[in-house]
């Protein structure tokens, strides 16, 4: 753990509060050379209603925080190659595939997702993964 991990993961937790999702709010920050280059939180695509659930089920088109942060940096024309992703929940397998393809070299998270296949895939791809405890 480096001295900035705690600060960035706390910032990701604050960013998660922007999510309209009721079941779980997740925030993500992409950091490169000690600068935040992108951010994201889980929610519906731009232009859609700000409701993530229908009844007690998450709508299938809700984007995860990691996907939002990665697509945002790609849209800006910047590169996430070699960046660190700070995310409040461990990535699912779909987000892990995006993380690998985006060239992100390190993932720091605070809460466990119900499945750990995403973490296993990241490690298999040589991405450094670290869980940090936040009080």
Q: What do the predicted segments below correspond to?
A:
Residues 1-135:
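Zinc-dependent deaminase catalytic domain
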